[in-house]
């Protein structure tokens, strides 16, 4: 699984200490994650979404994306300078199968009181983009596709 610190942990063995107590050996299966940080995050109900390289990157550098706003309403009406997925190597596409799995896991964790440590992403199709931004992007894409559709 790609999402969450808990998914980088593996509980290997249970060792009986006495009839009523057990010792558990927990190890981190992702070499990019620190044991102490991971266990503290889990205790504090905090998670991170790992990037495509399975690293806990907090900020995606998608600063080249330009939002075009309506002058009167202040609402985003278009996006400029969005590159291909190859340009945004850290972003998980929320519309891909793996992206949908990550989104579902994020929603489940947040509904249980967990907090995501990652910064919101400016890339509207990234799983870390704010929902409102992703919705506007999807709506604009649908409108553009409808306009370009042959009659």
UniProtKB/Swiss-Prot annotation:
Q: InterPro entries, alphabetically?
A: DUF5769
Pfam families, per the entry: DUF5769
Per the record, the domain of life is: Viruses
Family per UniProt?
Belongs to the mimivirus R69 family.
Q: What is this protein called?
A: Uncharacterized protein L781
Q: Which organism is it from?
A: Acanthamoeba polyphaga mimivirus
């Amino acid at each position: 699984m790609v999402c969450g610190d808990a998914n980088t942990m593996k509980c290997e063995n249970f060792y009986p200490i006495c009839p009523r107590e057990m010792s558990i050996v927990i190890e981190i299966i992702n070499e990019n994650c620190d044991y102490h940080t991971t266990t503290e995050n889990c205790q504090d109900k905090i998670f991170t979404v790992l990037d495509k390289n399975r690293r806990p990157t907090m900020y995606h550098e998608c600063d080249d994306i330009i939002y075009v706003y309506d002058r009167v309403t202040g609402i985003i009406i278009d996006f400029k300078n969005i590159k291909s997925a190859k340009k945004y190597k850290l972003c998980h596409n929320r519309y891909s199968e793996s992206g949908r799995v990550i989104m579902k896991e994020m929603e489940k964790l947040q509904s249980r009181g967990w907090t995501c440590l990652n910064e919101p992403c400016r890339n509207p199709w990234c799983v870390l983009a704010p929902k409102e931004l992703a919705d506007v992007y999807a709506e604009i894409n649908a409108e553009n596709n409808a306009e370009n559709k042959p009659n």
